[in-house]
């Protein structure tokens, strides 16, 4: 039976500082490291034995994956890194304090930027340090694919091809997979897996450092069950398709 574990990185420095992060490559806090280690412990207790891992190219997700795999004694499994699993790009909001941004633009506007499906924040300038054109890790990505800002819809548009070409076929082959990524790239995967409507995805949140363990049918698409392994820090999940 295929299994999939989705893990949002542990608490980052900018999570702690309440700043918009996006593609900015900030590190984990000590609490984030502890959450990542706990993820490995929770998955080990659940008997989870991944055969392959996927992760973004941002260090907070990479370190979360490594600490998790260490707890599983599975550091040896193959790991694929892809920019397509990066967090949503927050455009000109990157680095800004969220409370100050609410005070300036209003709660409702900021909620739309953060939680709506198809409204991106204002774009970042192409000469800004936070534009991916100026980051060497994206040197091999076609220029036209690099975002200056993203909505959840555009995040889904870049995540979905990677899911379809690299992740889902392995599930259909019966593998056990782990994906370490970010709040919005994982929301995109949740939308795909649970078939969540555009309006309903606004209310879906993915907590940091709490594995979402999903059991699938042999087709690697149909969900059998899904649960967060730490119920104390769990967020509500959408209903299973067809339930």
UniProtKB/Swiss-Prot annotation:
Pathway stated in the Swiss-Prot or TrEMBL entry: Carbohydrate degradation; glycolysis; pyruvate from D-glyceraldehyde 3-phosphate: step 3/5
Catalytic activity entry: (2R)-2-phosphoglycerate = (2R)-3-phosphoglycerate
Taxonomy, superkingdom: Bacteria
Record-linked SUPFAM superfamilies: Phosphoglycerate mutase-like
Keyword 4Fe-4S among UniProt keywords: no
Keywords: Gluconeogenesis, Glycolysis, Isomerase
Gene Ontology BP annotations: gluconeogenesis; glycolytic process
Site description Transition state stabilizer, residues in chain: 182
A Gene Ontology molecular function term of the record: phosphoglycerate mutase activity
Transmembrane segments: none
EC number: 5.4.2.11
UniProt xrefs under Pfam families: His_Phos_1
PROSITE patterns: PG_MUTASE
Annotated active site: 9, 87
InterPro entries: His_Pase_superF_clade-1, His_PPase_superfam, PG/BPGM_mutase_AS, Phosphogly_mut1
Family listed: Belongs to the phosphoglycerate mutase family. BPG-dependent PGAM subfamily.
Quaternary data: Homodimer.
Functional description taken from the UniProt entry: Catalyzes the interconversion of 2-phosphoglycerate and 3-phosphoglycerate.
Protein name: 2,3-bisphosphoglycerate-dependent phosphoglycerate mutase
Gene from which the chain derives: gpmA
